[in-house]
Amino acid sequence: MENQNTKKPLVNVKALSMMFKVRGTLFKALDEIGFTVNEGDFFGVIGESGSGKSTTGKCLIRLNIPSGGKIEIANHLLSGKKLTKENNQWLKQNIQMVFQDPYSSINPTKNVLTVISEPLVISKTVFGETKQYLKSLQKLSFKVKKTLLRNDIELETKFHNNFFKTVIKQINESLFNFEDLDYKDLKPSHLRQRIINETDKFIEKIRSEFALFYDFYANQSVPLQKALDDANSSLTPSSVIELKNQLKALQKQAKISKAAWDILQALKQNQKELKDYENYVHFELQKKPRIYLNTWLLTTKSYIKDSKQNMQLTDDIFAFSYNSMVDKKRNLVLILSKYYKLLPYFYDQSVFDNADQFDEIANLIFFDLVETLLGVTSLFNDALAADKVPLIKFAKFLNKLCDLRFLTLKKSFKKTRVSCSFSFNSEPEILFANSCYDLQQMPQIIKPFWEKLFNEQNYQKIIDSVSRLNVMIANYITKAFEIKKTIDEKLREFKQQNLALKKAYSANKKSEANKASINELKVNLKTLKKQLKQEKNTTKKQSKKELKPLLKEHHTALKLHDEFNHDLRKWFKKLNFMVKKYNRLENSQKKFCLVKKLKALFKKQDETLQSELRPKLKTFGVINFEYKRAVKESNVFRLVHFAKNIFKPFLFFNLTKIFMRNKVYEALDSVGLKREHAYRYPHEFSGGQRQRIAIARALITKPKLIIADELISALDVSIQAQVINILKDLAKKHNLTVLFIAHDLSMVQTVCNRLIIMHRGKIVERGSVDEIFSNPVHPYTRSLIKASPKLSKINVDLASFDENFTYDSDYSLTNMPFYIKVPNSEEHELYCTQKQFDSWIKEATPIN
């Protein structure tokens, strides 16, 4: 197993929650789950239906908006109600999802070409590539353009020679086979079959050459890259590219003095640094931290919703009081977050630091009340009937005391322009307590809790916690204003430098002392122009000599199309001749009577030889269509390469369509489909082929993460293996990270390296695949593995899955589960209580 510590984390999920509204209540589909996926991982997610697997995947790609928690993928925060424009664009390009039903992502009314290219249109990646292609053309020198023309002609000539020479040869072979056919000695049925077989054989050979069309389409942009490579490899100081660059620089430099030129360059550099610094400050110290802050607040609000719902649904006074206290604690955290509005700048990491510290201090402020309530709850279970009433009354009292403490802190919160602070006074609580209970008549069962709660040491701890909170807020505010001071000084320094450089530039621009250097530059300018002209003339002469034989060969190659049409007409004449011979031979062997003549009159049209051959001969129409398109696209590239710049924007969308189609061809090749499949519709494919199309659609934007949601569940075993092998090969080739959601444990064990097991919206076990399958500990995991069907004992296995799990029935306010690491393992962890862990570890044995 590869050491996971050497890999970079790609996906970081923390406290992810997803709640759905169901008839006025909130159903928690995901309950604060967290996991990390490293780059290049094949990460498995397994569990029964309804465990939250698909919901997790949909939250990552934002088909479901998470109710709370943090989702960070490649340092892009993707949780929260809204995404920034940049993060939204990044998400569309770098995360894709493949569903169990291919029709979830495939539109059945559109052909495969349109379906697969949809992500390119949505993410707009292909538009950027087209712009880059057109930009590279603007920088070409005269010499490189001539090289590009030569490469264009060579490509077109090669295509005509390869395709039409081969096809003409096949036509002649087919004509020879027809000539060699001795139809006089054959029966009509045998002759018919020979004609059909020969036609099928010829058409199949023609179809096998269609790949040359697709190669020609894909290679249209190759000449430009080849020309640029040739230009870069032969770059010399006297080359056209170098001369043009020098010419542009000197034209600008000749207008001003040398000193002014140097100052101008320094001014531009200073302005660029200023702009970069302002962008950094805006994004890293303002925009990005606010995004993290909003995510944290959303998570806190979802926790508050959860607490309020638990309060409404429970009929247990102790659970009600506990959830009420949790609600007050989280509302206090919301009040604390208000101080962020004072901060002009802060780091995103400070949000997480504050979140942890706020939670810790809020827990300390309410800890005495929560601890007392848990003690009362624990005592209530074993108490006598007479003691239960005062315990219930005391639980209600603790809840009201918590409300009072929260209101006291809320009212004491003071916020000014430069500070925020709380204050705490124990007097209101003591007065309230004395009004509720008489110390002399207080039940004995409550007295220990009362004495522990209402003493100076306890209240001093609360005052210390509040003071610590105030100090922490003051420190962060001070730090934020120090950052502001540093930024203001830096910006002021940049602006002062700009002013100084502008003044120096104005003073040196018309300096008489630089006349000599300006004259020298002008002389150099004239020399360079002469060099440029000479270089152009030399290139023209050389290119004429080089292009003559190429143009002659190209002209000869173009004539092959006419020769192909001529030979094809001959082949059709021969085929018609053979069909007529067959009809005569068939008629000569029939003895016609009136009844047979009437039968022949009403004979179905599709039973004749002509009707059987007609659909087969449509292939030649396809050749004509593909050739016309090849010529049209060749002309588009010729115009893009050599037309004036003013006309190129009108060709932008034509060029984009060509690039898009070529990418679709590459995607189809990568999943083992043919390029001609791009023009079919989804219903014309099998289930496995449709799933391949869905994978091609997901891969076309070259994403970093693919979420495979029960990708192979609906396919038969052999097709499952094919699809998984394709996905594994592509993941290895493109360094993809795959989140593999599945029911099939044997497949997960084969392809995944890390794994989480989900049940009822929680991760109950997680770790490496080898560690979990060699030593499954959690009862749910063991039941899943036992129920995995094996041919040797299928009757036993299918009946062994236990649906009525009660492991979580013991969880309570005083017995909360947490993650515990399994001994002698690297990352194998269980979600359980310590008592359960000790029991399960003893009982855990390998499952065969």
Curated annotation (Swiss-Prot):
Matching PROSITE patterns: ABC_TRANSPORTER_1 (PS00211), ABC_TRANSPORTER_2 (PS50893)
Subcellular location: Cell membrane
Record-linked Gene3D superfamilies: P-loop containing nucleotide triphosphate hydrolases
A cellular component term, taken from the record's GO annotations: plasma membrane
InterPro entries per record: ABC_transp_ATP-bind, ABC_transporter-like_ATP-bd, ABC_transporter-like_CS, Oligopep_ABC_C, P-loop_NTPase
Major subcellular site: membrane
Disulfide bonds: none
Enzyme Commission number, as recorded: 7.4.2.6
Positions bound to ATP: G47, E48, S49, G50, S51, G52, K53, S54
Enzyme class (EC, first level): translocase
Keyword list, A-Z: ATP-binding, Cell membrane, Membrane, Nucleotide-binding, Peptide transport, Protein transport, Translocase, Transport
Key word Transport present: yes
Function: Part of the ABC transporter complex OppABCDF involved in the uptake of oligopeptides. Probably responsible for energy coupling to the transport system.
SUBUNIT field: The complex is composed of two ATP-binding proteins (OppD and OppF), two transmembrane proteins (OppB and OppC) and a solute-binding protein (OppA).
Name of the protein described by the UniProt record: Oligopeptide transport ATP-binding protein OppF
Organism of derivation: Mycoplasma genitalium (strain ATCC 33530 / DSM 19775 / NCTC 10195 / G37)
Taxonomic placement: Bacteria, Bacillati, Mycoplasmatota, Mycoplasmoidales, Mycoplasmoidaceae
Originating gene: oppF
